[in-house]
Structures are given as structure tokens and as C-alpha cells.
């Protein structure tokens, strides 16, 4: 089973990397770009875990390690 985890900065948190990428895109002529936010994409391959235990484990992994929940949000998708 595969789990895709998306980690993004919370609204209102300054994203200096996103601002630098936006500036570079404008320099390259992509002036229509209004904003850039940079995040993380993580793929997990898991053995068989079912139902509530699976959700619980994924949330625990994100809260303990994969995301800094003070400044980041996360969401995930499960592909069985």
C-alpha cells in the first residue's frame, strides 16, 4: 500500500523559498505568476495495515516527524 503525504506551510507563515522562486520566475519572464508556496511531498510504502489503525499511524508519523505542525499542515492520500 502506498501513502502520499503533502506537507505545506500554514496560511500566514512567511515562505522565503517560495518568494525566491517567484522572483526567479519573474526574472525568466513568467510575470503572470502571482505567488509560489513551497512544500514537501513524501511517499510511504506500507505493509498491510487496516482502517483506523492505518489512519492513526499516518497521523502519528506526520505529527512526530514528517511535519512541523507548529508552522506546517499535512494531508495524505492512501492508494491500496
Language model region names:
Residues 48-51:
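Helix N-cap motif at beta-to-alpha junctions
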Residues 42-46:
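Short, well-ordered beta-strand segments in beta-rich or mixed alpha/beta enzyme
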Residues 2-4, 8-41, 57-80:
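Long, contiguous binding/interaction regions
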Amino acid at each position: 500500500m502506498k501513502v502520499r503525504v503533502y506537507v505545506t506551510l500554514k496560511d500566514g507563515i512567511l515562505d522565503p523559498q517560495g518568494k525566491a522562486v517567484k522572483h526567479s520566475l519573474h526574472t525568466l519572464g513568467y510575470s503572470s505568476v502571482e505567488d509560489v508556496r513551497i512544500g514537501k511531498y513524501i511517499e510511504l510504502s506500507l505493509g498491510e495495515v487496516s482502517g483506523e489503525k492505518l489512519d492513526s499511524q499516518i497521523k502519528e508519523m506526520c505529527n512526530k516527524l514528517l511535519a512541523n505542525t507548529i508552522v506546517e499542515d499535512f494531508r495524505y492520500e492512501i492508494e491500496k
